[in-house]
Every structure is written in structure tokens, then in C-alpha cells.
């Protein structure tokens, strides 16, 4: 049996649908979770979907993915711009890592244009709202050779 794709979402993403919907869209995190699970199922895969506002929890889950996941999709949110510890954890993985953002960081404030996570990512999907997660699932599925 193929291991699941782990999908991690960072700080403030629990507020999707209500926090700056003009930037992040109206979909809630539960909506995103359902869309990810449905997209993975079409490819014969499952998803472990988690969110935390705490850097240490995200790092623990990245480390868990080393043995429990076939690929990792991560929306690091603000930690992407600040967390070398998260980068170091991601560098320990030997599975595809897809960085995912709802908005396009390159089209936003200067401080959002650099992400440490990109240094460890296989690829990046950004700017498509909640569909960014689905596109990241699709990319991960392709990289692991799913149906």
C-alpha cells in the first residue's frame, strides 16, 4: 500500500475564509481539506491533513513524514519567510516536497518574496487560491507515480 501524502498548513491558515478573503479566498480550511482528499482519491492516494500555528509542531510533522509519507505538501505561511529550523527539517526528507501558497508571494510585499522553504522544495505552486493545494496534490501524485 502506498503511503499517504502529508499536507501541512502553517500559522493563521485555520482562519481561511474569514482572514483577508480578498487575498486568500473564501474557502475554509475544511473546504481545502475536502478538496485535497478528493483530488488524492482520484489518483488512488490518501492524505494526512494537518494545520498548526506552532513552528515546533510543523517540524515534528515534517520529521514524521520521513517514514510515514510518500510526499509532502506544505504551506508554511509566515514561517516560510522566517524559519531556518523548518528548512533544516525539510532538508532531511527523501520524498518530494511541494511548497504551496494560496496567493502569489512574488506579487506581494518584499518580505514575502523570499521563502526558505523553497530551498528544500522539489517545486512550488502558488497564486491559485485553494486550488493551489489541489495542484500541489496533483504534482506530488505525479512525482510518486500514482495513477
Curated annotation (Swiss-Prot):
Q: Where substrate is bound, by residue? A: 75, 81, 88, 102-103, 112
Q: Which UniProt keywords apply?
A: Amino-acid biosynthesis, Aromatic amino acid biosynthesis, Lyase
Molecular-function GO term, any one:
3-dehydroquinate dehydratase activity
A Pfam family of the record is DHquinase_II
Q: Which reaction does it catalyse?
A: 3-dehydroquinate = 3-dehydroshikimate + H2O
Q: Which CDD domains match?
A: DHQase_II
> What Enzyme Commission number does this protein have?
4.2.1.10
Top EC category: lyase
Q: Which PROSITE patterns match?
A: DEHYDROQUINASE_II
Query: A GO term (biological process) for this protein?
Result: quinate catabolic process
Pathway named in the protein's UniProt entry: Metabolic intermediate biosynthesis; chorismate biosynthesis; chorismate from D-erythrose 4-phosphate and phosphoenolpyruvate: step 3/7
This molecule's function is given as:
Catalyzes a trans-dehydration via an enolate intermediate.
HAMAP family referenced in this protein's UniProt entry, alphabetically = AroQ (MF_00169)
Q: Which family does it belong to?
A: Belongs to the type-II 3-dehydroquinase family.
The name this protein goes by in its record = 3-dehydroquinate dehydratase
Q: Which organism is it from?
A: Caulobacter sp. (strain K31)
Could you tell me the gene encoding this protein?
aroQ
